[in-house]
Amino acid sequence: MRSHLLVLLARTAALLTILVPAGVVRTQQPVKSATVRPASTMPTTVSYVQVLGADYAFESPDVLPAGIVAFNLVNNGNDLHAMAIFELPAKHTLRDFLNQYHSLGMIPTWMIGLGQTPTIAPKTEAFLTVRMKPGRYILACLIPARDGRMHTEKGMVKQVTVK
């Protein structure tokens, strides 16, 4: 029993001599001071936005409030759906996004992703909470349909404005 414990300690020590210099294992540094934010600077509300997904469209308000937004995606369609949210840079359009996404088969590098719901089955729902600043955003379903075409090609994409 004692020799087994010594072997285990020796192996652990040998492993640590490899991992610590490699940066795999880090020791926690003591915190010298913490930043405390006054309650007045913390967000006080969360906006709730329901997005209805169907085959193949999103129904939601065209204008959303800035701040923390909790999205509830409801899949009213007969196909699987998801909702990704991207900030649309000022120098680009929804058409720019769609052209590049469909021709390259990947999200353009200039898009700023905020998050995506899980892929959900028909008659189910998913939630996604993000912080949105004023600007233009795209809601897009990035999965392929049964016929191989992307849901965005079939119209499951929507531009919204955040104010």
Protein language model features and the residues they cover:
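Proline/serine/threonine-rich low-complexity linkers at boundaries of modular beta-sandwich domains
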Residues: 43-48
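Charged, glycine/proline-rich intrinsically disordered loops and linkers
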Residues: 105-109
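Positively charged n-region of N-terminal signal peptides that target proteins for export
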Residues: 1-4
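Signal peptide processing junction and immediate N-terminal pro/mature segment
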Residues: 22-35
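Contiguous segments within soluble domain cores/interaction surfaces
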Residues: 68-69, 75-104, 143
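Bacterial N-terminal signal peptides
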Residues: 10-21
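Extracellular/periplasmic metallocenter environments
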Residues: 34, 50-53, 57, 62-66, ...
